[in-house]
């Protein structure tokens, strides 16, 4: 076996924290007078920054918007972040770790923040389903490959 294959991957969570949080109920108290049948929209975004060698900040942005009759009942935004040490992997494996594995670690914390905020706004309980960040990351890679192929085709023409 080569030395590279013997090198072990190291993954450590240094810290998990809420970076930013926002809750708005722009149509309260009128929204409380209506029968609660909202349309709930979930938006997710991730980003990562290098803080030091093998040390990364990963930010998971979760936005939940509940609308009723085309009016916003509530808008909840959470930026859940973590500082992670990742050693022994590079390239696509590192991108997968930062773009899928770390968000999987962060999501339960973001979900708990959102549930608490919605409850404090006195809205009915909101249960966010688990998210498959691995599948989202694979979709992202496929889109990048398609864009790269389209861009290389344009350049050759």
UniProtKB/Swiss-Prot annotation:
**Family assignment from sequence similarity:** Belongs to the SecB family.
Q: How does it assemble?
A: Homotetramer, a dimer of dimers. One homotetramer interacts with 1 SecA dimer.
Supply the SUPFAM superfamilies for this chain: SecB-like (SSF54611)
Any one of the GO BP annotations = protein transport
Keywords, A to Z?
A: Chaperone, Cytoplasm, Protein transport, Translocation, Transport
What the entry lists under PANTHER family is as follows: PROTEIN-EXPORT PROTEIN SECB, PTHR36918
Location in or out of the cell = Cytoplasm
- Please report the name of this protein according to its UniProt entry: Protein-export protein SecB
The superkingdom listed in its UniProt entry is Bacteria
Any Pfam family from its record, for instance, is SecB
Q: According to the UniProt entry, where is the signal peptide?
A: none
Q: Which GO terms describe its molecular function?
A: unfolded protein binding
The record ties this protein, via HAMAP family, to: SecB
Major localisation = cytoplasm
What does the record give as the organism's lineage?
A: Bacteria, Pseudomonadati, Pseudomonadota, Gammaproteobacteria, Enterobacterales
Functional description taken from the UniProt entry:
One of the proteins required for the normal export of preproteins out of the cell cytoplasm. It is a molecular chaperone that binds to a subset of precursor proteins, maintaining them in a translocation-competent state. It also specifically binds to its receptor SecA.
Annotated Gene Ontology cellular components are:
cytoplasm
């Amino acid at each position: 076996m080569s030395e590279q294959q013997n090198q072990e991957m190291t993954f450590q969570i240094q810290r998990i924290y809420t970076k930013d949080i926002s809750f708005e109920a722009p149509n309260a108290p009128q929204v409380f007078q209506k029968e609660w049948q909202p349309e709930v929209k979930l938006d997710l975004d991730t980003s990562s920054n290098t803080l030091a060698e093998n040390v990364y900040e990963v930010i998971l942005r979760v936005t939940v918007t509940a609308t009723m009759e085309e009016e916003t009942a509530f808008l909840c935004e959470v930026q859940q972040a973590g500082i992670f040490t990742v050693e022994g992997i590079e390239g696509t494996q590192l991108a997968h770790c930062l773009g899928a594995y770390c968000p999987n670690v962060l999501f339960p914390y973001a979900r708990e923040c959102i549930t608490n905020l919605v409850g404090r706004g006195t809205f009915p309980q909101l249960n966010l389903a688990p998210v498959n960040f691995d599948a989202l990351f694979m979709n992202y890679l496929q889109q990048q490959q398609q864009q790269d192929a389209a861009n290389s085709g344009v350049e050759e023409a």
